[in-house]
Amino acid sequence: MKKIYKRLLFSGLALSMLFFLSGCVQMKNGKPTGEGWVYKFFAAPMGSVIQYLANNLGLGFGFAIIIVTVIVRLLILPLGLSQVRKMTYQSEKMAYLKPVFDPIQERMKNAKTQEEKMAAQTELMQAQRHYGMSMFGGLGCLPLLIQMPFFSALYISTRYTKGIASASFLGIKLGSPNMIITVIIGILYLVQSWVSTLSVPEAQRQQTRNMMFMMPIMMVMISIGAPAGGALYWLVSGIFGLIQQLITNHIIKPKLRKQIDEEFKKNPPKPFKSNARKDITPQANNDKKLITSKKQKSNRNAGKQRHHKQ
């Protein structure tokens, strides 16, 4: 489940940043003004390449969009795979250390007092640091930040490059929304989500399948009102996402499992002893001593008062 949550978090963050970076392109009357760093340094050059392929080489805007998208996605594919590798390494290592973390999480869940909950949280953080685990499961931001200007520029250039709005591709008007491309995008991202569940343990697979419709629905909602030129970008990106997921399932993940097994065989995890519980016990003992001291003092004062009355 945590792995799926991280994937959804990653996808949601990517989409949010995409639209945020789209805001770096200044618009007027629904068209780019030519200002904004994303447009100047990324979208405009990509648009020029699209026009060159479409007009000078006679490939047409549809194939030009596909070619430029493929080239850019291939260039940033190593970054995407590096991101996936880090996330997968952390999740696989977490699965290996599940017997260590589960009891702590169970204590945190069943804590009856705020002190017990805080102690369990502290113990969990100490255990994560002890075993070299990241709280965010390897969800580093640098590869994502590097990729997002390219994603945003591709989307802008496929929507607003001059000539695309009036062009056609395989009988599809690139300047208007197209239901066929939208349906294909929905199916493609659904397959991608389904493939991602294949690497999940059988016990958790049913839960993950209930969540795998979120990304396809999100992509359909984005594509259904977008011009076909922009939707074509999402379609090609979906194909790359599926390829990346297959590489993860059949190459990266088995290799990392073998690597982690060898790491733990050579250097078995040392037993973790937390001092989080000890942080509360002395305080409790001090409180008891303070209460006892107050009672004894009160009893002595009461005895003196009785003696005085006598």
From Swiss-Prot:
> What are the alphabetically sorted keywords of the record?
Cell membrane, Chaperone, Lipoprotein, Membrane, Palmitate, Protein transport, Signal, Transmembrane, Transmembrane helix, Transport
Q: Give the compositionally biased regions (Basic and acidic residues).
A: 276-290
> According to the Swiss-Prot or TrEMBL entry, at which residues is a lipid covalently attached (S-diacylglycerol cysteine)?
24
Note the Pfam families from the entry. Answer: 60KD_IMP (PF02096)
One GO term describing the cellular component = plasma membrane
GO biological process assignments: protein insertion into membrane; protein transport
CDD domains the record matches: 5TM_YidC_Alb3 (cd20070)
Chief location bin: membrane
One of the record's GO molecular function terms = membrane insertase activity
Q: Which residues form the signal peptide?
A: 1-23
Q: Does the keyword Cell cycle apply?
A: no
Q: Composition bias, kind Basic residues: at what positions? A: 291-310
Q: What happens when the gene is disrupted?
A: Doubling time increases for growth under nonstress conditions, unable to initiate growth at pH 5.0 and under 3.5% NaCl salt stress. Double deletions of yidC2 and SRP (signal recognition particle) components are barely able to grow in the absence of stress. E.coli yidC partially complements this disruption.
Do the record's keywords include Glycoprotein?
Answer: no
Query: How does this protein lie in the membrane?
Result: Multi-pass membrane protein
The places in or outside the cell where this protein is found are: Cell membrane
Write out the similarity annotation.
Answer: Belongs to the OXA1/ALB3/YidC family. Type 2 subfamily.
* HAMAP family, per database record: YidC_type2
Name of the molecule in the record: Membrane protein insertase YidC 2
Underlying gene: yidC2
